[in-house]
Structure formats: C-alpha cells, structure tokens
Regions:
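Compositionally biased regions
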Residues: 5, 19, 39-40
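Extracytoplasmic/secreted envelope proteins and their assembly/folding machinery
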Residues: 9, 26-29, 55-62, 73, ...
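Charged, low-complexity interaction regions
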Residues: 17-22, 221-222
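N-terminal module-boundary/linker segments of secreted carbohydrate-active enzymes
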Residues: 23-93, 227
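Secreted/periplasmic proteins that engage bacterial cell-wall peptidoglycan
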Residues: 72-145, 149-150
Length: 238
C-alpha cells in the first residue's frame, strides 16, 4: 500500500502479532472475466458501528484494490500454500498454537512444550459473539478452528496463482490473516468472500471487512465488483 496510508495494515499487524517479511509480490494476473454467478443472492450486510475501525481509511485502501473477475480455480490445492501451520516466524511454535495463544484467554499449556502447545482456553468468538471453551483432543479441538480471513482458495483466484511457493506459505501463516473462531461457523464460511459470506454477529462485520481489505492491500490481491460492493455496504453501517 502507498506510504501515505499505511496505518490500517500497520495497526492490523500490530494487533495480530509479528509476521514474516515478504518480498515484492509478482505482477497480478491479466484482466479476467467476471465470475459466473456474481448475481447470486448477497448476504445481509447489516453492521453495528465499531469505533475501532477507521472507515475512511478502509475505504481509501479498498479504492486502491484492483477490481476484476476472479481467475479460474483450476490448479488450486491447499498443499500449494505449504504445510498446514508451519513455524514461519521461527519462534519454535506452529502457527495454529500461536493464534490460539493470542486469541484465547485463561490458556493452559502442555508441559514440556515451552508454552507452545495450547491445551485449553476460552474463546470469545468474533463470528458468533458466543463464548467457547477450547479443550485439545481428538473429539474436541475442532470446536475452535483457525480461519483464514481471506480464504486460501479466494486468494488463489485473485492473484496468488502467480506467487512464489514461499509467498504462498507466508500468506497461509500470516497472523494478520488468521483468527481463532467457532469451528462450525468457519465450516459454513468455506472459501467465501464478502460477497457471499459475512460473520453472523453484526458487531464483528466492520472489523472483519477491514481485516479483509488490509490483507488484500498488503498482498496485492484484487476484489470482484460484487465483493467491493458488499464491503462498502458493510462500511455504511460502521
């Protein structure tokens, strides 16, 4: 993003924690057709005002994002974004545990892991507004999942196809783009962008779309026209 308006991305990174530095990103894909189905029913964009979000700054960054149709999903594979939850910041802990430690309260850790493996904690889920108890276990861990605010498949269709493997792995593990959330709600979201999915909790929508804009600005990803319109509708209520 331009040096004159770095605050949104800088503040988002400060809230999320340290993230690996990235090299200059490759050029975006040439202009492609608008995605089929862009006229599908849009989600309710009602949002509750959020004084922590600088709406004009978000709009300024949104206006700088390229607007065009998504690329085909052909060739997408989760493995192209590296192994799940790598230790890209080299702090000795995998990314999933880093985010759990950041987003949960009353956290307990497995002994002998140097404070890396989270055993339990409480999540105030941003997507539903509910309080969720997390307990590590084969049948319980999925209650809290780590969401990519900008989904990997969405990124793939909006610029990430041309990235290096290193940049894709950075993106998949960047704390700026990660949130601990309610597992079932995360599954409902899937790879949806703002044009097709928004958090059920209206109080989170301003921060959610602000984070999406910050991530796309930081990584040079584009938005579709329907996506930009959906974000703007949310911002009108912020």
């Amino acid at each position: 993003p331009p040096a004159s308006r770095p605050t949104l991305v800088a503040d988002a990174r400060a809230r999320a924690g340290s993230a690996p530095a990235r090299d200059d990103l490759p050029a975006l894909l040439d202009e492609l057709r608008e995605t089929a189905g862009s006229s599908a029913q849009l989600p309710d964009a009602t949002a509750s005002p959020d004084p922590s979000v600088d709406v004009e700054e978000v709009r300024a960054l949104l206006d700088e994002l390229e607007v065009k149709g998504r690329a085909p999903k052909a060739g997408y594979d989760r493995d192209l974004f590296g192994p799940a939850w790598a230790d890209t910041d080299r702090n000795g802990c995998d990314t999933r545990n880093d985010v759990l430690r950041r987003d949960l309260t009353a956290v307990t850790f497995k002994q002998g892991t140097n404070g890396c493996v989270v055993l339990s904690g409480t999540l105030q889920d941003p997507y539903t507004g509910q309080s969720i108890n997390f307990e590590r276990g084969q049948d319980t861990s999925s209650a809290v999942q780590i969401d990519h605010v900008v989904a990997l498949a969405d990124a793939w269709q909006k610029g990430a196809q041309k990235w290096s493997a290193e940049t894709r792995e950075q993106f998949a593990n960047d704390p700026l783009n990660l949130r601990a959330v309610d597992g079932p709600t995360n599954q409902q979201k899937g790879a949806g962008a703002a044009a097709t999915w928004l958090p059920p909790a209206t109080g989170d929508r301003c921060e959610y779309v602000a984070a999406q804009v910050a991530v796309k600005s930081a990584y040079g990803l584009w938005v579709t026209a329907a996506e930009a319109d959906a974000i703007e509708r949310v911002l009108e209520g912020c």
